[in-house]
């Protein structure tokens, strides 16, 4: 169930679902697994807010375990495509594809709440049952290219070498807010709507 907010206007009461009300304040919620429908919703909101006023920042709140690489990269590409700066605020967790999205916020405007977590790892893939050997080889090559592309983005976002990201992402690499700040994926830790 989505909560409804009622506001008083000059024309009387107006009700909004909570997400529409947040959108009025240029806030987008990216929560749950990254998949095509969620990505399309986030992208549409980014494009709408940029068209409305590209001089004002957009606030993207992130709490995701990750998910689809293609859906996540579509969000990242849109964040880079629009003129408005996108501030990212990690709450809960940004894991896997979520780290790529959250770390792609505007430089100097990437934030994290004090008890949130970050996790990087190598991308996962599969070919399903009954796959021919040549298709498996193609899938493996694509997975390696995808890994390199993601490592390149993460390295740029954190100011690290691709070699360092590759090493750290070999297995699940969890970081606290303080560790994420030291690593370079965020710019500040936020407490009580203020910077720590």
Curated annotation (Swiss-Prot):
One of the record's GO cellular component terms: cytoplasm
SUPFAM superfamilies from the UniProt entry: ClpP/crotonase
Main location: cytoplasm
Keywords: Cytoplasm, Hydrolase, Protease, Serine protease
This protein's record includes keyword Oxidoreductase: no
Domain of life: Bacteria
EC number: 3.4.21.92
Pfam families per UniProt: CLP_protease
Family per similarity comment: Belongs to the peptidase S14 family.
HAMAP family in UniProt: ClpP
UniProt cross-references to PANTHER family, sorted A to Z: ATP-DEPENDENT CLP PROTEASE PROTEOLYTIC SUBUNIT
Function statement: Cleaves peptides in various proteins in a process that requires ATP hydrolysis. Has a chymotrypsin-like activity. Plays a major role in the degradation of misfolded proteins.
Protein name: ATP-dependent Clp protease proteolytic subunit
């Amino acid at each position: 169930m989505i909560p409804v907010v009622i506001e008083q206007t000059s024309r009387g009461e107006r009700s909004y679902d909570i997400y529409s009300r947040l959108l009025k304040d240029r806030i987008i919620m990216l929560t749950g697994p990254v998949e095509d429908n969620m990505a399309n919703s986030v992208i549409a909101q980014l494009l709408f807010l940029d068209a409305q006023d590209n001089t004002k920042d957009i606030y993207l709140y992130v709490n995701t375990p990750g998910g689809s690489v293609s859906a996540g990269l579509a969000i990242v590409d849109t964040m880079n495509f629009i003129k408005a700066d996108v501030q990212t605020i990690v709450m809960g967790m940004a894991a896997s594809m979520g780290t790529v999205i959250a770390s792609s916020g505007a430089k100097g405007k990437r934030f994290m709440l004090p008890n949130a977590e970050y996790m990087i790892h190598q991308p996962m893939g599969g070919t399903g049952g009954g796959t021919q050997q040549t298709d498996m080889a193609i899938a493996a090559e694509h997975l390696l290219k995808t890994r390199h592309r993601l490592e390149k983005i993460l390295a740029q976002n954190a100011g690290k070498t691709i070699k360092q990201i590759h090493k750290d992402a070999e297995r699940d690499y969890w970081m606290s807010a303080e560790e994420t700040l030291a690593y370079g994926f965020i710019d500040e830790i936020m407490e009580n709507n203020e910077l720590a």
